[in-house]
Amino acid sequence: MKVGGFQPVRGTKDLLSEEYYKLFHIQNVAQEIGERFGFMPVQTPIFEFQEVFCKTLGDSTDVIGKEMYTFADRGGDVLALRPEFTAAIVRLLLSEKMQPPARLFTAGPVFRYERPQKCRQRQFHQINYECFGAGGSQADAEIISLAYCVLEVFGLHCDVTLEINSLGSSECMNAYRASLLSFFEKYRSELSEDSRRRLQTNPLRILDSKDATDKEILSTAPSIEDFYDAETRASFEGLKDHLTNLGIPYAVNRRLVRGLDYYTGTVFEYKTSSLGAQDAIIAGGRYDNLVAAMGGENVPAIGFAGGVERLAALMSYSRTRKFCVFILPISEEVVSHAMRITYEIRRTLSGVQVICDIVTRLKTGIKRADRQKADIALILGDEEVNRNAVSCKNMLTGKQEEISISNITEYLKAMMAERQ
């Protein structure tokens, strides 16, 4: 552990004001869009019992095998920082005894021990939507359209490609898994180390390999489409029809699988070519067996997550700047008067930033106001106090005038109206 220099832990970063505003703008807008679709906000703890994730994500996944942050507390419980939201939201659904149908939105930080790179840190933020109690292709299309709406609002829908696939029913997946196992056994010695490990645990995960040799082998691998039953085939055709009807362009990718083992049926990803290897910015799918696997009843469910930092890297955002008032008491004797004026403006005017800075030289105070990009500087000295007034300097035009303290709020309202 390197402490010298007091830098952030590798894979984490500080958020300065502009980036903070951008990330939380994304989360706030995402929540508002979710509410249009009937999703209500909830929040789960940052850490859960480790079993919440180990029981659901799959032992063969990188998240469980290599990436999860775990620790034992003083009571002996083994806990984990959440590596994703879905399992935690299912736990919430069950522990709070929510009855489906339920549509839940959440957002916040998640944690994975990965190799840090562009748009891939060990602490990052996600927006997350989970829909419980809705099955069928119509529900799938609605969730995919919600994701499209998020991208559209942020101006990114033209810069992404939607890829869809179906993993089919449990019977389809079992038959396909057996076929893949037989196929990959012929290439065992050529597969990457990760893929050889996945061959023993879940050969479907090899389809997600980024290794060049693995990709070449995959080019002749069996397609899951060959193992669809009639119901799966009809459902997937229905999904394509719904997306076409909604005007949402898509591409079928028969190699598309998700990185967690709980997925069944429809899976999808919105991808971009603008972020290098981290091409998925929104991804999700159906997980009809997960609620039952965690001790609940059989409940159809579908959802998705979006990477907030990845969305932020692609979109432009300019925060609306608050009208800034810089109050300059230029002697200790008038500080109490300046504090009263500052408090009154903050109390009565919304959408305004008020800074009170004690200075001994007016020139220094004006420079500070200029650095702060203040709209108005209110100058208060002994003479102004004696006249029960304040000198108002327009930082844009340089014009300066004296205003009665009793009229200062109305004066600032008028100035704010001019700037709009």
From Swiss-Prot:
Kindly list the places in or outside the cell where this protein is found, as annotated in its UniProt entry: Cytoplasm
Q: Name one GO biological process term.
A: histidyl-tRNA aminoacylation
State the signal peptide span.
none
Question: What are the GO cellular component annotations?
Answer: cytoplasm
Enzyme Commission number, as recorded? 6.1.1.21
Q: Name one Pfam family in it.
A: tRNA-synt_His
Q: Which coarse location class describes where this protein primarily resides?
A: cytoplasm
GO MF annotations for this entry? Answer: ATP binding; histidine-tRNA ligase activity
Keyword list (alphabetical) reads: Aminoacyl-tRNA synthetase, ATP-binding, Cytoplasm, Ligase, Nucleotide-binding, Protein biosynthesis
Under the heading PROSITE patterns, the entry gives: AA_TRNA_LIGASE_II
- Which catalytic reaction applies to this protein? tRNA(His) + L-histidine + ATP = L-histidyl-tRNA(His) + AMP + diphosphate + H(+)
What interactions and quaternary structure are annotated? Homodimer.
Family that this chain belongs to: Belongs to the class-II aminoacyl-tRNA synthetase family.
- UniProt-recorded name of the protein: Histidine--tRNA ligase
| Organism name | Anaplasma phagocytophilum (strain HZ)
Query: What gene codes for this chain?
Result: hisS
